[in-house]
From Swiss-Prot:
It comes from the Bacteria. Belongs to the methyl-accepting chemotaxis (MCP) protein family. Gene3D superfamilies: Methyl-accepting chemotaxis protein (1.10.287.950), PAS domain (3.30.450.20). It comes from Vibrio cholerae serotype O1 (strain ATCC 39541 / Classical Ogawa 395 / O395). CDD domains: MCP_signal. This is Toxin coregulated pilus biosynthesis protein I. May function as an environmental regulator of TCP biogenesis. Negatively regulates the synthesis of the major pilin subunit of TCP (TcpA). InterPro entries: MCPsignal_dom, Sensor-like_sf. PANTHER family: METHYL-ACCEPTING CHEMOTAXIS PROTEIN MCPB, TOXIN COREGULATED PILUS BIOSYNTHESIS PROTEIN I. The keyword NADP does not apply. The keyword Magnesium does not apply. Keywords: Cell inner membrane, Cell membrane, Membrane, Methylation, Transducer. It is a peripheral membrane protein. GO terms for biological process: chemotaxis; signal transduction.
């Protein structure tokens, strides 16, 4: 327990120390940030002020030069202007000094140039001479020297008239002097360094983003810390100059970082020492106050082992006294419970034996009842099945009788229909016989006509023969007539032959008509006999239908009686099944009661065994 309390205390101490350290860390970090920002801003302002002062100085110098050389420039005193330019260049170390006249002639420290500023439309010339404004360019790399150069140009006045322009080419390190406190670098818009302190002078003319990639993503007004190869810490910040150039200010923050680390270490050491002192004090207090825990633990262990002993009251003079008193009360109550439980278990064991005997007797009686009920239920079920079979047979017979009645009715209808059709056939045969008789009469008439045609063809043949004879007598004049007569005779012969064929056909038609008349007469006789048989068959079907109807009525009565008997037997069987189910439920309940009683007996035995765990020891 003491170990757990100490562990919790150590955990809390670590958490508090960590929280305070984090708070102090952020507080110191904020102070450090403010300090670095202040130093960086101060150094940047000083460097910007120096830059601006230099720029103002050269602007004023340019104005002074414009006043000094006004008359010489107006008169184009070439040698004098070149000498002045050379002297100024040597005195101030400018990259170049140029005086330009109105026509664009350029007088420099190296002599008069052979190219014209006006013709080339130099930006500084146009703005100063033509527009009359002061001008200075951004830093650009001079093609001759490779240095970054700032050009300052001012118009030259004589009275109110512009007579020319003065231009000074100033190196970047002239405007931003490397002397002074602090480290810095100035770059153009492309991050090319044109001025720096002496420490970083090797970077002049180089791309700063390639030499110092960290500087590329700097935001104006913020700083970034970094360390060199010797783990020396610095902070760098960026400031815009003239909207295009950039000033990178570098300050040494090694002392600030060391102070910050030392303060953090002191805080951690102080809290660690304080925690150790508190831990020692806590251990001493806990050891003194919890000395009685061991005795209480032994007491509880003896109770857990079933040893119930009388003990003298224990006093610890702290909260443990309450626990000791509670244990003493628990021991007294536990003693009463164990004694009462032993007595109750003995009584319960006796009662359980009596209950077991009663349950076994009831179970035997219920099993006998169940056997008798099952026999009655079986007989009832068989009776129900027999009634059901009788009902089914009666219903089947009734259905068959109904089917027979339907078939008889349908046969009766068929016979009636057949009789009607027979009568219609008889009538049709009579009509056909009349038509055949008429056909025979027509054949006789046609035969007389063919006789007439035959006589005509004989006479025509005879006439044609006579005509041929007369044509032969006529000679050449009767030849055409002889041909016609011959054709007529030929047609008469064909007509006579056709008439003979028609007479043969008519004779056959008359013979067939006579045979058809005889057959139809015989069919009429047969149909009459069929009608007589149909009438007798209808009478037989009527008698059969009456008998089948009587059988159907008897089957209906038998089916109804069998159905009622089936319903009664099914109701009896259902009631017997319910009785059997109740008896089975009683048997199951008795079996469960028996099992529960056995379980109670087992539990009683187990409880006695469990209570035997407690060993009561009383002191005299």
């Amino acid at each position: 327990m003491i170990k757990k309390i100490i562990s919790v205390f150590l955990l809390l101490a670590c958490i508090i120390t960590s929280a305070f350290t984090a708070f102090f860390y952020h507080s110191k970090l904020s102070d450090q940030t403010k300090s670095i920002s202040s130093l960086s801003s101060q150094q940047a302002q000083e460097r910007l002020q120096s830059y601006q002062d230099s720029l103002d100085f050269y602007k004023k110098l340019n104005i002074s030069l414009s006043v000094a050389i006004a008359n010489s420039l107006r008169d184009k005193a070439v040698e004098e202007l070149n000498a002045i330019a050379l002297r100024i260049q040597e005195n101030h170390g400018f990259i170049g000094v140029t005086f330009a006249s109105l026509d664009g002639t350029m007088f420099t420290d190296i002599g008069t140039l052979d190219w014209n500023a006006k013709t080339l439309r130099r930006d500084w010339f146009v703005k100063t001479v033509e527009l009359g404004t002061k001008h200075y360019t951004a830093f650009d790399i001079d093609k001759t020297t490779g240095q970054h150069v700032l050009t300052i140009a001012t118009p030259v006045y004589v009275g109110n008239d512009i007579v020319g322009s003065v231009a000074l080419d100033i190196a970047g390190d002239q405007i931003a002097s490397p002397n002074g406190s602090g480290m810095f670098m100035m770059t153009d818009r492309n991050f090319n360094v044109f001025a720096s302190d002496l420490t970083h002078s090797t970077l002049i003319g180089k791309d700063l983003t390639k030499e110092k990639p960290l500087f590329k993503n700097l935001v104006s007004g913020q700083y970034v810390t970094f360390s060199d190869a010797d783990s020396h810490w610095f902070a760098v910040s960026q400031t815009e100059i003239d909207g295009e150039n950039k000033l990178f200010t570098i300050i040494d923050i090694q002392q600030i970082v060391q102070t910050y680390k030392r303060d953090i270490q002191l805080i951690i050491a102080g809290f660690s020492g304080f925690s150790c002192v508190m831990l020692i004090g806590l251990y001493w207090v806990l050891s003194k106050e919890l000395s009685g825990v061991r005795q209480i633990r032994e007491w509880i262990l003896s109770l857990s082992d079933g040893q119930i002993k009388e003990r003298r009251p224990i006093k610890f003079h702290n909260e443990l006294d309450t626990i000791a008193q509670s244990l003493e009360n628990l021991q007294f109550r536990l003693l009463d419970v164990v004694r009462n439980s032993h007595r109750t278990m003995n009584d319960l064991s006796i009662k359980q034996t009596d209950i077991t005997y009663s349950i076994e007797g009831n179970t035997n009686n219920s099993q006998q009842e169940l056997g008798l009920i099952e026999q009655v239920a079986t007989a009832t079920t068989q009776l129900s099945c027999t009634s059901f079979d009788v009902m089914q047979q009666a219903q089947s017979a009734e259905l068959n009788a109904e089917t027979a009645q339907k078939l008889i009715a349908e046969s009766h209808d068929i016979i009636d229909s057949s009789s009607k059709q027979t009568e219609m056939v008889t009538l049709s045969i009579h009509e056909s016989q009349q038509i055949i008789n008429q056909l025979r009469e027509f054949s006789d008439n046609i035969s007389s006509v063919t006789d007439v045609i035959n006589n005509i063809s004989d006479q025509t043949n005879l006439l044609a023969l006579n005509a041929a004879i007369e044509a032969a007598r006529a000679g050449e004049q009767g030849r055409g007539f002889a041909v016609v007569a011959d054709e007529v005779r030929s047609l008469a012969v064909k007509t006579q032959q056709s008439t003979i064929d028609i007479q043969g056909i008519i004779l056959k038609l008359q013979e067939q008509s006579q045979l058809a008349d005889q057959v139809m007469t015989r069919n009429v006789s047969l149909i009459h006999e069929t009608q007589v048989a149909n009438r007798a068959l209808i009478a037989s079907f009527n008698l059969i239908s009456d008998k089948v109807l009587e059988i159907s009525n008897i089957n209906s009565i038998v089916s109804t009686a069998a159905n009622e008997q089936k319903i009664v037997t099914e109701d009896v069987a259902k009631q017997m099944e319910d009785i059997r189910y109740l008896v089975q439920e009683n048997l199951s309940a008795m079996e469960r009661t028996k099992q529960a009683n056995q379980n109670i007996s087992d539990l009683t035995t187990n409880l006695n065994d469990a209570l035997s765990f407690f060993k009561i020891e009383l002191t005299s």
